[in-house]
Structure formats: structure tokens, C-alpha cells
Amino acid sequence: MVTVTRVLPWRRRPRATVEETSTLLTEFRSRHVGADTTLIERAYEVALAAHAGQTRKSGEPYINHPMSVATIVARQGLDDTTVAAALLHDAVEDTPVSLDDLERDFGTEVRLIVDGVTKLDRLHFDTREEQQAASMRKMLVALSKDLRVLIIKLADRLHNMRTLAALPEHKQQRVAQETMDIYAPLANRLGMQEVKDQLQDLALATLHPKRYSQIDQMVQDRSPERDLYLAQLVGEVEGRLAELGIAGRVAGRPKQLWSIYEKMIVKGRSFDEIHDLVGVRVIVDSVR
């Protein structure tokens, strides 16, 4: 008996080139040395073919979005299954690809993660009441039986915030406020500090553009002395760890603009009264 298999367009796609996926694969391999990337490369091929001809509001090829989301996810250290799901997170909602197709080609885990993200995409929030916002955050967590769903959703929101300028002004305001009320606190709850900081700064730039520009300029004016101080501080901490025989990683960073804005507006401080413009993070294997 001859079995006729439906020939899907993404199965006719040639393998992805190294150039097309280099940034994503570099991020993934930097955290998973020697890991197999076949699943990620196949997911890219499917996403590229499925979104062929589609563009975003900005006019750029749609594939740029799932690629960016997957790169953010890879930067968080997630496994190949999660990165593959990130590449495919819009495929079911926006293309002919079905959940059954994903399960057949990528397995049950990818199907469940993509299904979870698709369901979250259908939720919309329109309140600024903190109690209701807290309830919505709890609902998002409850609906995400797998935390990887939330991580992809946060990465999706981060890239959408980075490209927010393509939307009409009223939508920019709504999305930015929703980001501040719902998604930034969720990122903080999951320990995704870098994502949380970026979400808050991007939301601030949209909600209070003049204040954002003023603070950004003041921070830039101080950047030479700040960078010198930060380098010295990191060096001192690294030296002290070495003296004590403690293995660890030390990372310094400028404080986010949102935290400076909070101190100036909420606590009524002037910029000159804010001295903690840098932060240092020390990561060790264990704490005694």
C-alpha cells in the first residue's frame, strides 16, 4: 500500500544558512557548549517558510520577530526545546502551521509550549488598578503550567517594546502601561532582572518621553566617571574573591533609568542626590 504524505511548504525548505542563524546559535552555544543545535535550526527553517511574505507593522520581515524572541530566550540559558518553541511561537496563530504539525515535527513539548503562548496572546488587560493588575499576573502564572511559556511571553513582550514605534500613539501608550503593570513585575518575579529592567526603561520612554530624555542625558553626562568607578569596583571585588579563594563571577552595570526616575519622582530627590548610579552583581556556586 502506498502512503501519500501531505507535502507541507516548510518541509520543502532548504536548510538554514549559518549566517541566518549565527547570532541565535552563538547565544545558545555560549551557554550550552557542544550542544546539538539541530532542533533549533529545523525550527528556524519552519518559521522562515511559514512566515514567508509576512511583514510587521514596521515593514520588516516578520521572521525578524521570532528570531529576536528566540535570541532573548537563548540569552536566558534555556534549552533547545524552549528556543525552538520561541522560534515557532506565532506559527499556529498567524500561519497555516497547526499544533499537530508541530507535535509531529518537533515533539509534544514544543507543541505544549507553543499552545500555551498562543493562549496567553489572546489575553488583553486594560486596567491600572494595582489589585486587578496583581490578579492578572496571578492568572498569567496559573495559565502557564510550564514556566517556559511565561519566559517566551516575556521575551515576546520585550521585543515588541523594542519595536513599539511602529504602532499608533494610543496603542503605544496602552502597551507600555500594560508592560509596566503586568509584565515587568512578572519578569522580576521570575528572576529575569535584565529583562525586567529593559521592560521598565522602554515603558518609561513611551509613557514619559521628555523625562526619560532628561534623565538619559544626565546619566550620559556622568558616564565617564561612572564607568571608571564601576571598573575599579569590579576589580576590587574580583581581587577580594580571589584572596578568599571563592570562585565567582562579578558583573557591573549602570542602574536602569526607571529606578532613577522613581527616586526623583516618587521620593522627590534631585539627580545630584542620587549616588547609586551603578550596581554590582556577584554570582557564586554556593553560599555558606
Task: Give short role names for the model-derived ranges.
Residues 1-279, 284-288:
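Active-site helical microenvironments for divalent-metal-assisted chemistry
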